[in-house]
């Protein structure tokens, strides 16, 4: 369960970085 939370956090950070790169 802990690794799932880590993946979720990484996904959120990656998504924010991707959106920032697109803008």
Swiss-Prot record:
<comment type="similarity">
    <text>Belongs to the frog skin active peptide (FSAP) family. Dermaseptin subfamily.</text>
</comment>
<dbReference type="Pfam" id="PF12121">
    <property type="entry name" value="DD_K"/>
</dbReference>
<keyword id="KW-0044">Antibiotic</keyword>
<keyword id="KW-0964">Secreted</keyword>
<keyword id="KW-0878">Amphibian defense peptide</keyword>
<dbReference type="GO" id="GO:0005576">
    <property type="term" value="C:extracellular region"/>
</dbReference>
<comment type="function">
    <text>Possesses a potent antimicrobial activity against bacteria, fungi and protozoa. Probably acts by disturbing membrane functions with its amphipathic structure.</text>
</comment>
<keyword id="KW-0929">Antimicrobial</keyword>
<dbReference type="GO" id="GO:0042742">
    <property type="term" value="P:defense response to bacterium"/>
</dbReference>
<protein>
    <recommendedName>
        <fullName>Dermaseptin III-like peptide</fullName>
    </recommendedName>
</protein>
<dbReference type="InterPro" id="IPR022731">
    <property type="entry name" value="Dermaseptin_dom"/>
</dbReference>
């Amino acid at each position: 369960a802990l690794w799932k939370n880590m993946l979720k956090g990484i996904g959120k950070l990656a998504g924010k970085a991707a959106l920032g790169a697109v803008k």
